[in-house]
Amino acid sequence: MQIRQWNKILIPYEQAVEELKVKFKGIRTELREINEYSPIEFVTGRVKTVSSILEKAKKYNVPDDQIEEKIEDIAGIRIMCQFVDDIYSVIELIRQRDEKDLKVLYEKDYLHNEKESGYRSYHVIIEYPVQTAYGQKKILAEIQIRTLAMNFWATIEHSLHYKYKENIPERIRERLKKAAEAAHRLDEEMWEIRDEVINAQKLFEVKSNTVSSIVNNIQLLNLIGRKGEAREFQEKFEALWEKGNVGDLKELLHTIKYVVARFQAFD
């Protein structure tokens, strides 16, 4: 295929990656906005380069005219989680969308069936409809769900595969396996303190959202000409901020909102 043809072929894949990133990031944002724990830590995505596609097609003897049907990861989404349990929560979120805005074709469980190299992850192969300028096009995409520790290890391993053209020296392979085991132990240790970590993060989110709302409402008082009240609340806020008590900050926010609503009603 000519380069010009490839550029045209890959456009729907680029669109799919951007749409899927927005959707999964949206889940994370929505949960955090309502102070709920999000199993999604962050999301990335990419479309394979033409050279990578051709290399994979050559490796698996895929004819040019079957590349889009046989190579499932031209479009790739990677979802990172803090804990192993979160991976299964994300998988369930994807399954719930089956036959809605995407179709789950099959899954690959490398958590319970890790690769010989030590690779761990969970892959979901989907069919995703893209609305193009020429009508709807259904494409294949791979969603990889893994922990931060798994992702760190996989990124290093991928770089070494690229450097050694998949012929990684045995001594490095052995060290990689040991590193994979260490990453697995780290995930297990983090799971043991999961509740404490989540509670701390929730508290941070609540405090952050409360402070942001207080500042916005004080600014609003200034905008509607209530500078004296704004200055008074600013001083109270600074005093409470030093103490760091979330309950006191919430109470202050409630009072400020009441005052703002009262003054706006008179305007």
What are these language model-derived features?
Residues 4, 11, 71, 80-85:
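Amphipathic alpha-helical interface elements
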Residues 9, 13, 17, 50, ...:
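Generic alpha-helical secondary structure
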Residues 16, 71-73, 118:
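Solvent-exposed loop and beta-edge segments used for protein-protein assembly and interaction
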Residues 16-61:
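Surface-exposed, low-hydrophobicity interaction/linker segments
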